[in-house]
């Protein structure tokens, strides 16, 4: 789970950066 947290954050960050 701990390893999945950063993975999810990275995906969200990419989406936000792409959307912004």
From Swiss-Prot:
UniProt note on tissues of expression: Expressed by the skin glands.
Glycine amide modifications at: 20
Key words of the record: Amidation, Amphibian defense peptide, Antimicrobial, Secreted
GO biological process: defense response
Source species, domain of life: Eukaryota
Gene Ontology CC entries for this record: extracellular region
Segments passing through the bilayer: none
Localization (cell): Secreted
Family affiliation: Belongs to the frog skin active peptide (FSAP) family. Phylloseptin subfamily.
Purpose: Has antiprotozoal activity against T.cruzi.
Protein name: Phylloseptin-O1
Gene: psn4
